[in-house]
A protein has these predicted regions:
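A short, compositionally biased domain-edge/stem linker segment
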Residues: 1-3
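Substrate-recognition "cap/lid" segment bordering the active-site pocket of phosphatases
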Residues: 112, 118-167
Length: 167
């Protein structure tokens, strides 16, 4: 195994959900959390049911399955509000993340975030958790115009911003 020399590190690109922030459980349970806010107990495997659906199809499923007297758009808006509240008020950094980011900052290593999450949620979470001061730039898939699984573009843009070769 090659020894890492700190002077060899020219930049760092981090995903946000599940890497910097302990947010994956929220994504697994957003529908359940929304229904709980409506006073409804979700079925135990709701996340599996919704996983393969678009937001619209998932909202229509919840509308029909739980007898919600809301439009699919209102349900989507409610789920989005649940997500917004989580990022703005509840999400916490993963263990060791603040220390790692402080270390990188101490050595003037640029840090970027490349995420599928919308900028408003990213900024709210990073500011509240105190991590924003360590991040030099945020790149979101919606702003880049393509998802991370479909293209390396978001990583290439982050590397270019830091003046480092993409590797």
């Amino acid at each position: 195994m090659k020894k890492i020399v700190i002077s060899d590190i020219k930049g760092a690109i981090f995903d946000m959900d599940g890497v910097l922030l302990d947010s994956m459980p929220m994504w697994d349970h957003a529908g359940e959390m929304y229904l709980a806010g409506q006073g409804i107990q979700a079925e135990s495997d709701l996340e599996k049911v919704l996983f393969t659906m678009t937001m619209m199809k998932g909202a229509e499923y919840m509308q029909e399955h739980y007898g919600l007297e809301l439009s699919a758009k209102e349900i989507i808006d409610g789920i989005n509000e649940t997500v917004r509240d989580f990022y703005a008020n509840k999400v916490e950094p993963k263990s060791g993340v603040p220390e790692l980011l402080r270390f990188l900052k101490r050595y003037d290593i640029p840090v970027t975030v490349a995420t599928s999450t919308d900028r408003c949620h990213v900024e709210a979470a990073l500011v509240r958790t105190g991590l924003m001061k360590y991040v030099d730039r945020i790149f979101t898939c919606s702003e880049v115009g393509v998802g991370k699984a479909a293209s390396p573009k978001i990583y290439e843009m982050a590397a270019e911003f830091m003046g480092t070769p993409a590797s």
